[in-house]
């Protein structure tokens, strides 16, 4: 089966060590588990690993198989296909042999050295905690051997392993492999091959692996890993070797599993291609197809079986706000309407006192309800579902009761000092809370104090009230008719947030004072389906945001002219948190800027051209810049706008899919 190369990194980039160590790949299994590393197969993060499993028991993500030292022995020479960093040195010291990295149905590596040409591919198996690593020997002058050393960590993915006496070092023979049961209460790891291998048990700890990216982030960056032994497999020209690492022994042939998973991914690619066909421009079709393919990695079934969206890889879990902002682009616009409805239906069951969870726990902790806007994004997500073919009967029977409970809870007042004021606007929080999306704290204090009446919360509130009023009429539910309230909110919104002389919206109103910082939150007052602003005011908001906040990779969270602006997202955790929403760029906001830009534009054709060129340039430059084929979470506010945060963020990809589809539906004239 011929595989399509979506992205390629050639030798000119891979030969630059510093550059190559910033290029990362990711493969997922639909359960929240993943495999990930750099293109050099050198782990630079504690989150890297070949089998990072989202376990049911113990709950959470665990790095099981951290690294695989793989090498080819030919004659008297040993050629290493992977590398690692120890204090002051890389191993191996000699030049690496990566000729090309490509991402097609899965990450694929091509190595060349002294007459040897070998291909490696890595693939997680859908709905299994199993990774397959395949080696195809295209050319080998003499018969040789593939030598493999697996290194296990068996720890939570936020932690690091240190050598300890508790790890059980004994291995047990299985069919074409072995199993290791390192700790009581943890699953085993089972390593198997498709061909006979010589197994040499040689249990030993290797100390002081270094993870450079963790050092950059201000965390502990040294780890000890355990190697249970060595596998050696004879190879020659035409050989195919497949390694399986899993929590369960495999009874099927590994070749058949590989073929089945490849066929499944090929079918998914055809489906993605069909959706992208509706776009007129060939480059746009390629970008949308790749975004949809990338977006699929976020759709998971949690260990409890609940359909969910992972907010970002590597370290984010299942976040309510991110889910609701992401799911229209990742489901309804990506040919997965049933999955979208299942996610909404599942989330609805967790409403409590009008609030939907900010975070769904993947361990023993309770779900977190510390949010004001998740419930408001719920209304927007239902609007998007309805816009793109959702079933109104499903909304009435399953979602409408929840929508009414949310509004009632917010109107009457609920947790976190959330209530509707006499002016109809929505109040949220106090000085100790951080319940909007700008929620970073330093030493327990919110960095961006947004309690009171935040502008985007009230834009979302107005949108929700208008939408419920619309549905109330459609469903003949007269209890939820809000014509007078709509007029009151509309007037109060302008009176409270509009800065007449500057023609833009302030960010938050509190204690009689309007914070006039130029932030991107105001763009929602234009982009949402129901705007609380007269159309004449849209241009002012859009132009202010464009002038101060628009970058080639998204919107800054604060104007560079503000004294509190932080242009670089770097340093330890406290320093980074202080910059997270104080100038750092977020690409998820591109979609709302684009939507507002189109609504405000007098010349729709010119606006469409501007936005399409913007997206094309962004994707050309970024998709092989950090996470290959992925959209990063954030970027520096200052040029050259380095990517940072998670290498693959759900709402970043989802927003671009949605904006692409919006522009495609907009006539050129």
Language-model segments: what does each one mean?
Residues 358, 411, 415-423, 427, ...:
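Catalytic cores of carbohydrate-active enzymes
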Residues 257-275, 287-291, 335-349, 392-412, ...:
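Extended, well-ordered alpha-helical scaffold segments
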Residues 1-280, 314, 321, 332, ...:
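Terminal accessory carbohydrate-recognition/targeting modules of carbohydrate-active enzymes
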Residues 268-313, 342, 346, 560-564:
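Conserved oxyanion/phosphate-binding beta-strand-loop segments in alpha/beta enzyme cores
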Residues 226-231, 306-323, 362-375, 439, ...:
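Solvent-exposed loop and edge beta-strand segments that line ligand/cofactor-binding
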Residues 79-106, 113-117, 412, 543-553, ...:
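Non-catalytic C-terminal accessory modules of carbohydrate-active enzymes
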Residues 139-140, 161-164, 182, 235-237, ...:
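Aromatic-rich carbohydrate-recognition surfaces in CAZymes
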Residues 209-218, 293-306, 347-357, 431-443, ...:
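Active-site-adjacent bridging/hinge elements
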